[in-house]
Amino acid sequence: MGWACLVIIVCAAWRPAPAHAQPGLSAAADVIFYGDNTEFRNAFSEGETMFGVAARGEARIELGNGVRLAAGVAANQRFGSESAFELVRPVLALSVRGRRSTFIFGTLETPRAATPPGPDHAGPHGLLPPLQRERLAFDRPFEAGLQWLFHGARLEHDLWLQWQRLNTAEHRERLDGGARLQWRVARTLALPLQAHIVHEGGQLFDAGPVRDSLAIASGVVISKATESGPSASPGDGSGKAATTGTLELLGLWSHHVPDRQLPQRTRDGAAFFGRAALEWRAWRTHLLMWRGDDYLKDEGDPNYQSVRRDGTRWRGIRDYAETGVTRTFVPVAGAVLEASFRYHRIEDHYEYSYRVLARVQVAGKIR
């Protein structure tokens, strides 16, 4: 049924060109090499070191008027794994692109690693880590569903809905949807809104509880940028030595339903998230602080959650903080290298982590 719908949409979008014209054809690749060492264990999270590469290659057919059909393959390979690939999926996407807006049906445009820089921005859609953990960009670098991207003078957003699993006799279907919006009110002030929900359900098979996990975040973003002339550092990806300071203050609300048939297990939580960052040339430093009360969110970073690793409830206020530094290198156009170091405080537990990323994006016209 899904494939039939896609064929119908492609046929509807295709408007025959004159006999002398042919659809444009190009090829593109997006490859992310990742090395993430958060090998520390505490009461809330397990430690794991991840090294590997997530790659996506595709052929693109330009049908005209901003309509593009893409087909290819995506794969994720973990270094040291007994399997050749942890994940292999077909890339199939129909996109309609305008001056500011892009609609995608099929394989989504994720992840966002290294754009913008910083490990705390590395999630698949750039959500706050309590809503969606950063490491999903490496655990699950492939997503498929619907997506609407918009980049305007004041408003930008990423809205999506993606299916992770079908409803079978063994398990419920699983899908997630979200929104990351920011409205620039003034040059130095913006209003963000982020939301994410994970749902498990389906009516074909009754295999387990129906679950929902929702979180919403909103607040203010204050930023100030100054330029002090040409950059003296080659390969730093910046034509000028710009200094940008950013302060984010957001409140969060969570609604966690582990089983709709057992409403007494439903938990609502609230939290505060604050982050200050300073970017200068190819360097970025950040400090973030978190205070949460009964906050629970599927796919959120466990270091922010009000539940222990063994599943027991944390009663009282949860505290988390981290500080870090990131260095970005741009040796050539289309290639970005990022190295970061972070120091974490999880209640009374202190640990450090580091991450190395390299992202290469290339595209070329065939005809």
Regions found by a protein language model. Give the residues of each.
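Repeated loop/turn-to-beta-strand initiation elements of outer-membrane beta-barrel proteins
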Residues: L25, N65-A70, R100-I104, R154-L159, ...
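Transmembrane beta-strand segments that form the barrel wall of outer-membrane beta-barrel proteins
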Residues: A29-A43, R68-F79, L155-N167, L191-F205, ...
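Outer membrane beta-barrel transmembrane domains
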Residues: T115-E134, R260-R267, A277, A282-R342
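Outer-membrane beta-barrel "beta-signal"
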Residues: Y350-R367
